[in-house]
Amino acid sequence: MSFQSRLGCRWVRFYVKRKPPGEAALVEFTRRRFRTPGWLVWYHSLGAKIERIERPVKGEWVSSRRHSRADGVIYYLHGGGYISGSAKSCRPITVTLARHSGARVFALDYRLAPEHHFPAGLDDTAAGYRWLLANGIDPRSIAVAGDSAGGGMTLALALQLREANEPLPGCLVCLSPWTDMTSGSDSLRENSARDSMFVAEDIERYASAYLGDHSRRDPLASPLLANLQGLPPILIQVGREEVLLDDARNLHANVHAAGGSSVLHIYEDVPHGWHYGAPFVPETGEALREAANFIRTRIQT
């Protein structure tokens, strides 16, 4: 474990692990504590070109001023438990991916719960993907990527496209994905003490805020429970001490059982959300370079 990762684990545990009771308090706490500091957003904007889009979808284009090319596109879906986060807050990831891959990144602002329950955010995600296609982007040149809740939504989007017989992207990248809302995995209990950010009860509370009364077994909410045949190649990254470890491991196993292609990399001694640590955490740089390399070799340009 690097010094930076060790420090990050301690900071996350102190700052965000203990959450207040009640849904309204949880939402306020998450949106305040998970907000990317303004100085870090500014820092990552250096050397990048940012173009804000407000309609017909909301989000931002991110490209590297020095390494951009016009063909490949990464469609990025931010994390935040479906109740927080934004295209701006995930800029540490999107700018780094743009720099390492040379692709343009479109980060979507989708509607958040509990103001907008499932499937509002997923509907926005599908609309954003179709908007990319309507602008002449070849689906085979698109990588869909996301972290945490965004990783689960990445899979849900691919499942929705497959069922509708719409063009699939060239590949998927799932960073610490949340794929199962039924709270049935062993790692939820076994890693509750070790995970720097979450305990099992947190996952239950975020699921309730997102779904309301909707079934947690809906495969578009819990894509781990879906038929995973016919999906694009997938890269999965997760930390060994995360409560979401089994969400990632079981996804990898189920994709292979369905005849698909999946690469799983389990990182040691990193907190959930370590992908936001660029450029200060060495493990973050390693993970995002791996993701960029995976994307470069699997999208058609």
What are these regions (language model features)?
Residues 1-67, 300-301:
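A glycine/proline-hinged amphipathic helix-loop "lid/cap" segment
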Residues 50-301:
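Alpha/beta-hydrolase superfamily serine-hydrolase fold, recognizing
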